[in-house]
């Protein structure tokens, strides 16, 4: 639901690293000394002293979370949050989860959390109001439709333009529809993704464009008939446009420097790759279509 990045990260990273007493850029921040410095400095900047306050939306969907329980450490984003906490020296029982609706997460103002992890894509517009970490997942967009819809078999670039799409306000799925598919009919916009799904199920729209992992879940488990059989399919995913997820912080939060240090360490030691293989590996097999 969302992701130029390099320049912004360099500026924010430099500011944050100075504030926290860490050293180096994203590449050098994975060193033992940088993490050691972060473990000492992070507590002074926690939203609630003595704990790391992490936000996400409710409900929290698979595969990012499992059983709508962020605190169980299961699902990609839950596991990543705890892995970051571990790199920063925060014990598991000192990670506290709070609810932050997706649509309000990237509006300007005071945030009542240390960071938000909620499939939030970095965009230049959002970065004017909040601060993002470096990427913890590079994401593609995909089409979800009912199995009976013509788009399942007819999705050439020209054909894609003829369908009526629907999506949640402010998502990168909606942006992809408008910027890349460029349909002849104005997409319908909803305040929640569940509303778009309901419209899809009742044939009010032809398709939804969402992050590929979300699309797989929607098609296989969320959109079902009365007999609990899937009635939707993931038509395919689009080529990457460089979209990526970042942790979201209040604008200028000095914690971002050390979180970037932790993310770099998790990339270097293979933790992120292993978690992606565990929770997100299936999505690499979704066929690629070109708009």
Language model: regions and residue ranges:
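Ligand-binding clefts/hinges and TM-proximal coupling segments of bilobed small-molecule sensing domains
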Residues: 29-43, 172-188, 227-229, 261-291
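Extracytoplasmic small-molecule ligand-binding "clamshell" domains
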Residues: 33-116
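Extended ligand-binding regions for polar small-molecule ligands
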Residues: 78, 87, 149, 171, ...
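Periplasmic-binding protein-like
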Residues: 58, 138-145, 223-261, 282-291
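Bilobed "Venus flytrap"/periplasmic-binding protein-like clamshell domains
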Residues: 59, 73-87, 120-124, 139-197, ...
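A ligand-binding cleft/hinge motif common to bilobed small-molecule-binding domains
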Residues: 104, 120-129, 178-179, 206-241
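Acidic, polar ligand-binding/catalytic clefts
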Residues: 93-157
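Secretory targeting and sorting signals
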Residues: 1-29
């Amino acid at each position: 639901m969302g992701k130029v990045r390099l320049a912004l990260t360099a500026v924010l990273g430099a500011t944050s690293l100075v504030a926290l007493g860490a050293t180096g850029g994203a590449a050098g921040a994975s060193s033992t000394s940088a993490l050691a410095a972060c473990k000492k400095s992070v507590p002074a900047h926690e939203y609630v002293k003595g704990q790391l306050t992490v936000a996400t939306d409710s409900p929290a969907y698979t595969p990012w979370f499992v059983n709508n329980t962020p605190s169980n450490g299961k699902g990609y984003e839950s596991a990543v949050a705890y892995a970051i906490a571990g790199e920063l020296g925060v014990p598991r029982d000192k990670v506290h989860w709070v609810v932050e609706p997706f649509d309000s997460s990237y509006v300007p103002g005071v945030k009542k959390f240390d960071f938000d992890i909620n499939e939030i894509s970095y965009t230049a517009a959002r970065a004017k109001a909040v601060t993002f970490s470096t990427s913890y997942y590079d994401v593609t967009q995909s089409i979800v439709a009912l199995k009976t819809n013509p788009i399942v078999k007819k999705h050439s670039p020209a054909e894609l333009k003829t369908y009526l799409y629907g999506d949640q306000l402010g998502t990168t799925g909606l942006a992809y529809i408008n910027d890349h598919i460029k349909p002849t009919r104005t997409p319908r916009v909803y305040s929640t993704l569940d509303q778009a799904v309901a419209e899809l199920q009742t044939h009010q729209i032809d398709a939804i464009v969402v992050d590929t992992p979300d699309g797989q879940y929607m098609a296989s488990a969320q959109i079902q008939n009365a007999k609990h059989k899937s009635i939707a399919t993931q038509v395919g995913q689009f080529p990457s446009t460089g979209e990526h997820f970042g942790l979201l912080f209040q604008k200028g939060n000095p914690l971002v420097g050390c979180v970037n240090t932790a993310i770099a360490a998790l990339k270097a030691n293979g933790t992120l790759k292993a978690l992606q293989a565990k929770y997100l590996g299936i999505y690499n097999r979704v066929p690629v279509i070109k708009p």
